[in-house]
């Protein structure tokens, strides 16, 4: 949502993808329209390659693609199910690749692809193995795509740190994690979205991951 609103404020019309959160999508649509921008809702299951290609085939042109959909299953290595492993890799890694592959042909005047990774890609989170692996691989994919699609299309990643407390993280664990951050607080939403603004405005940056984590990856 925040990335879509940022793009709308920068003057872009928006294609807003959602899977099952139709109420939230409609609310975001209204917020974007209040900024006098056009917005088109696109429902799709991004773990299904057929639905990805159907979604992209309806686009005439594209300037910026933000890959932010993610699945973060909790579970140690000995407890993680094959289903959760596959879903995490399909949504967090395969979908961004297929979207980049399909959308590149729509960026006829050049464009920007931004993959949303995670500070977890810099760490070894044993309680989120499939998520951590997928995000680390997505950063590698970002570099590969940047070389493959240059000079017409730039490809970068943003790796946020902690922003909002997840329902699966107990309050005491959240406080412990925040206490480890050198800047001693979670990120504000606008501190993450400003990285997207930077990548749009600076057209000499490609193949890079912008880490916005308050220094957490240092500890």
Each language-model region and where it sits:
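Conserved NAD(P)H cofactor-binding loop of Rossmann-fold oxidoreductase domains
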Residues: 68-73, 214-215
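Substrate-binding pocket helix/loop in short-chain dehydrogenase/reductase
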Residues: 76-77, 81-89, 169, 177
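Active-site helix of classical SDR
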Residues: 100, 134, 142
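Canonical Rossmann dinucleotide-binding motif of NAD(H)/NADP(H)-dependent dehydrogenases/reductases
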Residues: 1-15
């Amino acid at each position: 949502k925040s990335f879509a609103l940022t793009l709308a404020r920068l003057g872009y019309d928006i294609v807003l993808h959602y899977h099952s959160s139709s109420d939230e999508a409609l609310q975001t649509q209204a917020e974007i329209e209040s900024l006098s921008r056009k917005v088109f809702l696109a429902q799709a299951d991004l773990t299904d390659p057929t639905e990805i290609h159907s979604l992209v085939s309806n686009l005439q042109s594209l300037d910026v693609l933000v890959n932010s959909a993610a699945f973060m299953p909790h579970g140690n290595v000995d407890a993680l199910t094959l289903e959760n492993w596959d879903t995490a890799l399909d949504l967090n890694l395969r979908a961004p690749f297929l979207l980049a592959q399909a959308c590149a042909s729509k960026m006829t005047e050049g464009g920007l692809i931004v993959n949303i990774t995670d500070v977890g890609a810099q760490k070894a989170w044993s309680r989120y193995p499939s998520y951590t692996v997928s995000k680390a691989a997505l950063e590698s994919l970002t570099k590969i795509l940047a070389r493959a699609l240059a000079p017409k299309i730039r490809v970068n990643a943003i790796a946020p740190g902690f922003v909002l407390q997840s329902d699966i993280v107990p309050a005491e664990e959240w406080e412990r994690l925040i206490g480890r951050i050198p800047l001693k607080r979670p990120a504000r939403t606008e501190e993450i979205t400003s990285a997207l603004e930077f990548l749009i405005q600076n057209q000499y940056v490609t193949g890079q991951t912008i880490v916005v984590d308050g220094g957490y990856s240092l500890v």
